[in-house]
Each structure stands twice: as structure tokens, then as C-alpha cells.
């Protein structure tokens, strides 16, 4: 059984018919392809739940209440004054990296292109901006409960994580007079107001029913599980490691009066030969860049064809040919689990491969054959190099019998991505065709 189908079956037994799959992201800068694994893992489990007849939603929580943590290289030093302020409440950068007060918010600016990229791979989540959940008062009950049980939560975090919290630690971070959470000390609580003093010597009160502060991450995550009724949220191995935020979130969620999702951990995507993706290290391939090179169904197959607990080597070089070959072979000769000649191991593999093909399609329920566009990846790579115009490619495909009439949108999109790949640094040199433009008289 495919891992997504197995998870859907398990969720049905544990939580019943109603399921909420979730993933999320902090819109602090450019996203990398590593984020795609969490998102597609959750989305594929959601699809598997629907295929199993369950009532399922897929939500995507944007951590827009998270603060700007530092001035990133693409930002001007003017952003120094916004450190500690929620991303939803600070301006997006202009082309020079300066704050643009007339544009989008910082969170919206970086989120938009990412959602466009998700749409290209068939992911259409229900987007929830976390600052709106705070401003609507949905967090208020959880915040009050966390404050009233602060010592119990402190004990959970210190015992499970093995780290000692500061003596002034408080399970709520109010915004100070300058809109930043940094340098703010809580002085008291009278529901619904948290009283504070900030680094500027000013005093004030934050209303927990509004977006005037937020829960620390480990408590925020546990609280949202209950607020949104989340039953499934895959976590990266950093959060899912022993003592990590998932382990502390489970008992905190129960303490706050809700049932947490089962623990589900995925391995990271690594750039082949370069280690895990990391925004801070610069070791990234953006999802938009990847989609300009890789057919979306093959990008989905990269995730669908690997168990969640196995790391993935993301290679936009020669290995892309191999991945495309594997995908095309399975589509052209689909596995048949009902074949009586199969061994038990072969039948399990056939069921798993069938699930991977089903979940790799951009549109749920579509025929995988339609994604091939009538021509193999390798053949198109050859034609795209020796034919300078798209019309010449189409004519060649008509002559070879691969195409009759006009090319469909799938084939046109494939050729566009192929030309992008050939023109990029990622295309393997041993696959590059050098066309001699002049006859050598010697």
C-alpha cells in the first residue's frame, strides 16, 4: 500500500471520517524546494483521504505572526527597525531591498509567488494567515489556558527538550510600543490583558483577543492543532526529533484541551552532493526555478515515489533523465496488482507504484497517460537542441508519428521547460548536443 493510502487508512481508524491535513510555512524570504516535500506530503495524504471516501480538508497555515528575525542579505539596513515585528505588519521590500510602505505586507510579498508555484503542481490549499486567526480572537481561549497553566507548560518543555527556560519566561509574547516582541517583559495578567514594559521604558497592555502578541512557537503549534481540528501534519526531522517541538506539542495540546495529531516525520530533500536545503546557507533551489525546469508531474512523482522517512536527492542534472524514464515506464506499462503470477513482494510493489502514479497527477483523478504528451523526455531533449523553433519540433514529431495535428498544452509546456533546462547550468554536459555551424575544410 502506498504510504499516503496507509496513512489515510490509519487516520480513519484513529480519528473517524472527518480529517484535516495541514502544512505551513514562515514567509520570511525565498522558499526552497525542500518546503515542497512537507506540502506535497500533506496534500497527497489529503487526496488519499478523499479517495478513501473521507471528509477531508487541506489547510496551509502561513506563519504571518512570526517576527522578522534578522536583516537578510536581500534587505537594506532600514529593516533593522522591524526586527521582532510580525511579518504581517511590516512592509515588503522594493527592488532595492528598501521598505515599500505603499506595497504589500512582507508576508504577502513572499507568499504570492509560492502559491502560484503550488498551483502549477496541482496544490490548491485553503490558506490561513495566522495573524488573522489571532486578530479574530480564535487563539484567545488557548492563550488564557496557557497562561493559567504556565508552570505545567514550563515543566513539559524543560523535561522533554532538556533545556532550561529563562526565569522571566512567559507563555505569551506581547508586542511592545514599537510593534516588536523583542525586549518586552511581562509584568502581569488580567484577562484578557497582558501587561508589559518594553526596552524603551514604556508600559502597556496587549489584548489576547487581538493580534497584539503571540504564543511562543512550541505553544502556538500545539494550540493551532486544536483551533483548526488538525488530524495530520507532517513535520521535518528537525521538529520531529526527540525533544523537538512535535514532542512538546503533543502534551501541550492535550493540556490546552484538544487532541493532537499523530506524530508524522519526513526526511529532508538534499541537493545532490551538497547536503540538506537551507535558506540561511544559500544551499537552495527555489520551487519556481524547479518548476521552470522539471515537468510538474515528475516533481510530484519525486515525492510520491519515496517513503516519507527516506531522504531525497534532488538532482536537476543527469538524474532527471532517469527519473523521467522511470515515470514514463510506469505510465506506459502500468503495474497490475491483480496479476496472479506476481509474488507477494511484487504485488505490494505494484500497489505502491500504482498509488504513486495516481498521486503524481496534477489534477486528481486524471489519467497518467495524458501527462506523457505523446513523446518521451529524452526524445524531446534531443529535438529541443537540434531544432531552433517550436514549429520545427512539432513538424519533426509529426514526421516521426509522435504528433498529429496541433500540440496540446501539456506538450507545449514540456517543450518550454525543456528549453529552460537546456539553457540552464543544470543541464548535463554529456547530454548536450553541439551543432557545428560551419564546415571544417580540413
Language-model-detected regions and their locations in the chain:
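Active-site cores that bind ATP or allylic diphosphates and position pyrophosphate for catalysis
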Residues: 119, 123-288
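Basic, alpha-helical terminal appendages of large translation-related enzymes
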Residues: 1-18, 30-31, 57-59, 154, ...
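Arginine/glycine-rich "motif VI" loop of SF2 helicases in the C-terminal RecA-like domain
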Residues: 51, 256-260, 320, 338
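Conserved adenylation A10 loop of the ANL superfamily
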Residues: 32, 180-182, 295
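N-terminal Rossmann-like or analogous alpha/beta NTP/dinucleotide-binding catalytic cores
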Residues: 1-154, 249-250, 256
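Aromatic-acidic/polar surface patches that form glycan- and anion
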Residues: 31-38, 238-245, 292
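An acidic- and aromatic-residue-enriched active-site/binding cleft used to recognize and process polar
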Residues: 23-27, 61-65, 130-132, 201, ...
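Catalytic adenosine-cofactor/nucleotide-binding cores of aminoacyl-tRNA synthetases and other
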Residues: 241, 246, 267-433
Amino acid at each position: 500500500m502506498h504510504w499516503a493510502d496507509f496513512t489515510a487508512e490509519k487516520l480513519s481508524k484513529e480519528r473517524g471520517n472527518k480529517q484535516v491535513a495541514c502544512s505551513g510555512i514562515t514567509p520570511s524570504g525565498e522558499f526552497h524546494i525542500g518546503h515542497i516535500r512537507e506540502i506535497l506530503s500533506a496534500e497527497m495524504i489529503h487526496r488519499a483521504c478523499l479517495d478513501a471516501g473521507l471528509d477531508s480538508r487541506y489547510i496551509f497555515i502561513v506563519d504571518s505572526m512570526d517576527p522578522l528575525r534578522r536583516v537578510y542579505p536581500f534587505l537594506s539596513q532600514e529593516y533593522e527597525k522591524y526586527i521582532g515585528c510580525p511579518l504581517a505588519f511590516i512592509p515588503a521590500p522594493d527592488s532595492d531591498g528598501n521598505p515599500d510602505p505603499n506595497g504589500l505586507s512582507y508576508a504577502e510579498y513572499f507568499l504570492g509567488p509560492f502559491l502560484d508555484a503550488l498551483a502549477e503542481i496541482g496544490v490548491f490549499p485553503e490558506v490561513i494567515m495566522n495573524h488573522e486567526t489571532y486578530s479574530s480572537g480564535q487563539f484567545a481561549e488557548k492563550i488564557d489556558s496557557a497562561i493559567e497553566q504556565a508552570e505545567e507548560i514550563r515543566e513539559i518543555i524543560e523535561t522533554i527538550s532538556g533545556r532550561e527556560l529563562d526565569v522571566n519566561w512567559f507563555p505569551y509574547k506581547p508586542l511592545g510600543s514599537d510593534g516588536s516582541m523583542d525586549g518586552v517583559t511581562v509584568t502581569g495578567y488580567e484577562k484578557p490583558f497582558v501587561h508589559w514594559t518594553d526596552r524603551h521604558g514604556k508600559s502597556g497592555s496587549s489584548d489576547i483577543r487581538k493580534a497584539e502578541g503571540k504564543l511562543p512557537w512550541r505553544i502556538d503549534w500545539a494550540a493551532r492543532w486544536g483551533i483548526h481540528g488538525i488530524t495530520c501534519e507532517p513535520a521535518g526531522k528537525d521538529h520531529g526529533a526527540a525533544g523537538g517541538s512535535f514532542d512538546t506539542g503533543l502534551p501541550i495540546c492535550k493540556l490546552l484541551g484538544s487532541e493532537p495529531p499523530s506524530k508524522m516525520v519526513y526526511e529532508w530533500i538534499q541537493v545532490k552532493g551538497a547536503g540538506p536545503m537551507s535558506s540561511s546557507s544559500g544551499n537552495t533551489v527555489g520551487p519556481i526555478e524547479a518548476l521552470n525546469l522539471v515537468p510538474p508531474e515528475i516533481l510530484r512523482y519525486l515525492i510520491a515515489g519515496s517513503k516519507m522517512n527516506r531522504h531525497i536527492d534532488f538532482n536537476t542534472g543527469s538524474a532527471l533523465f532517469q527519473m523521467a524514464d522511470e515515470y514514463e515506464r510506469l505510465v506506459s506499462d502500468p503495474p497490475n496488482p491483480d496479476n496472479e503470477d506476481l509474488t507477494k513482494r511484487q504485488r505490494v510493489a505494484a500497489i505502491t507504484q500504482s498509488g504513486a502514479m495516481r498521486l503524481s497527477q496534477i489534477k486528481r483523478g486524471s489519467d497518467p497517460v495524458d501527462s506523457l504528451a505523446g513523446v518521451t523526455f529524452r526524445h524531446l531533449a534531443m529535438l529541443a537542441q537540434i531544432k531552433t523553433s517550436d514549429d520545427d519540433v512539432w513538424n519533426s514529431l509529426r514526421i516521426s508519428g509522435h504528433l498529429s495535428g496541433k500540440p496540446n498544452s501539456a506538450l507545449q509546456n514540456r517543450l518550454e521547460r525543456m528549453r529552460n533546462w537546456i539553457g540552464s547550468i543544470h543541464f548535463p554536459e554529456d547530454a548536450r548536443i553541439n551543432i557545428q555551424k560551419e564546415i571544417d575544410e580540413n
